[in-house]
Amino acid sequence: MKIQFAPHNVPFERRLQTAAVLQWVFSFLALAQTCILLFFVLLFTRFWIISVVYGVWWFLDWDTPSKGGRRGEWLRRHVIWTYMKDYFPITLVKTADLDPQQNYVVGSHPHGVLVAGAFTNFCTEATGFHRLFPGITPYLLMLPLWFRAPFFRDYIMSGGLIPSDKDSASYLLKNKAGGNAVVIAVGGAPESLDARPGAFTLLIKNRKGFVRLAILHGASLVPVFSFGENELFDQVDNPRGSWLRKIQEKLQKMMGVALPLFHARGVFQYSFGLIPYRKPIATIVGKPIRVEENPNPSSEEVDKLHKIYMEELSKLFEEHKTKYNVPADKHLTFV
């Protein structure tokens, strides 16, 4: 394989953008493991008191992630996210107002490999979420296991992430004052196994928990689609039914996280590595779907609203796809 190295005269601004994305990839793939290791290593050094004090704090603070978390605007507004946004670049597009007196369940599609669009738009202020949607506070859901990692849990809570379980989402949606938007990557980790350039396959047909959640609390549903999310990485071929896909699916069920074999570019060369390609992402926020509150929704009611949601998501995709270089004959595939 011929390696294409980056030129020496890359502008300093672009180097900062690459560095910002590098730290994000590291935080996504290895920061939790590093924090766990650090916690235990410190116990066997003269700095053992740090882990002991943190352990006490951790015990007292155990339920915070499921009760709205602990946001840190200093982190959400840090300049590093602006550099990351400009690397791709990433844009947030508003198609309708969101009433700050209402709560929302936002469905984000597709998951992609590393959820770059959803993270940048809803966990940082780099794309101006609060300017576009004043009075709305977004909370991105993440696997609960990551909130059990010392130090790392505080970092992700600062960005506005909360555990992806019913209790955590309900805590926010029960607030009658409104203004909370619970953002769910509906396809979850399994959908990342279908993330590759040109793919528009969404794992949603049997994913109805987010719809039921919206009905339970009378929260409006908002479809969101990020054009370009699946263009960031190549992935080893793993068609459904292949031996590789079967292994990945089995590991996903055992571990709770998917393991897509992805690759893109490196820091100093463009031929291989785990740094995403510089491909634009446009996140389109659709119009809200009004939902009537029902503490005991029937299966038929959930199915009906789920169908409406998929229709609105398809409509959102079709209305905007040509603006983002998606061929006219390409359509969403729901599985």
UniProtKB/Swiss-Prot annotation:
| Pathway(s) annotated for this protein in UniProt | Glycerolipid metabolism; triacylglycerol biosynthesis
Membrane-spanning regions, if any?
24-44, 47-67
What does it catalyze? a 2-acylglycerol + an acyl-CoA = a 1,2-diacylglycerol + CoA; a 2-acylglycerol + an acyl-CoA = a 1,2-diacyl-sn-glycerol + CoA; a 2-acylglycerol + an acyl-CoA = a 2,3-diacyl-sn-glycerol + CoA; a 1-acylglycerol + an acyl-CoA = a 1,2-diacylglycerol + CoA
Residues folding into a coiled coil are none
Keywords in alphabetical order: Acyltransferase, Cytoplasm, Endoplasmic reticulum, Glycerol metabolism, Lipid biosynthesis, Lipid metabolism, Membrane, Transferase, Transmembrane, Transmembrane helix
Protein location: Endoplasmic reticulum membrane; Cytoplasm, Perinuclear region
Q: What is its main location?
A: endoplasmic reticulum
What name does this protein carry?
2-acylglycerol O-acyltransferase 2-A
State the gene name recorded for this protein. Answer: mogat2-a
